[in-house]
Amino acid sequence: MAKHLYKTPIPSTRKGTIDRQVKSNPRNNLIHGRHRCGKGRNSRGIITARHRGGGHKRLYRKIDFRRNQKDISGRIVTIEYDPNRNAYICLIHYGDGEKGYILHPRGAIIGDTIVSGTKVPISMGNALPLTDMPLGTAIHNIEITRGRGGQLARAAGAVAKLIAKEGKSATLRLPSGEVRLVSQNCLATVGQVGNVGVNQKSLGRAGSKCWLGKRPVVRGVVMNPVDHPHGGGEGKAPIGRKKPTTPWGYPALGRRTRKRKKYSDSFILRRRK
């Protein structure tokens, strides 16, 4: 999608960008309210996830990650903004009268036709099992367990690659660089998720980030020693440690946070970068 730069003398929007080709008028039968629990706080009101809070009210869009309409062609009617994710979503009108949302594949435009099922064409936006895809296919919205819906490669610009098939398993290279095994019966969507340049978008002002529910981030080196291990000192002092740490004293860079002896370790052939 093309990004447009605000042309205004107002300082608050001088550097902001906006995508004018995306609508934001969801259908009433495909949305519902969603209670945002605490916004970074636990049941006692204590902050457990920093830099979260505030933000505009949101309505949840029901996304069809399972692609339930099998062997029924659908047409892309609109490309819409979703406040719950970085990727855009598409409203699909199916041949049997049903309507639903899917993630917007990169390059898809209004009027394109998509379909899901077995033995369907290998074209952008179509969903089919991994066993029916040739090696080297770029895919997204990948199932881990058959029938549970896509769980991998769903963020804006995400794309995975099918690199091998052996027995009942397929080998995928995920956006993180991880190489793992997935059952060949699992569904995946052909192509890359749209809105690739989301990380290049300029919000223009701090208030725009507050609307997204993101609070300011303060460096530990400017805090007091009681608040952060990097804090304290006279003037602009260094952190006073060999390596950076988290506010709780754990190593901040390079520390492995994945749970040991997890059931899915046997499916991971190479860890992420």
Curated annotation (Swiss-Prot):
It holds the Pfam family Ribosomal_L2_C. InterPro entries: NA-bd_OB-fold, Rib_uL2_dom2, Ribosomal_uL2, Ribosomal_uL2_bac/org-type, Ribosomal_uL2_C, Ribosomal_uL2_CS, Ribosomal_uL2_dom3, Ribosomal_uL2_RNA-bd_dom. It comes from the Eukaryota. Disulfide bonds: none annotated. Its main location: plastid. GO terms for molecular function: RNA binding; rRNA binding; structural constituent of ribosome; transferase activity. The keyword Chloroplast applies. It is found in: Plastid, Chloroplast. PANTHER family: LARGE RIBOSOMAL SUBUNIT PROTEIN UL2CZ_UL2CY (PTHR13691:SF57), RIBOSOMAL PROTEIN L2 (PTHR13691). Part of the 50S ribosomal subunit. NCBIfam families: rplB_bact. This is Large ribosomal subunit protein uL2cz/uL2cy. It comes from Oryza sativa subsp. japonica.
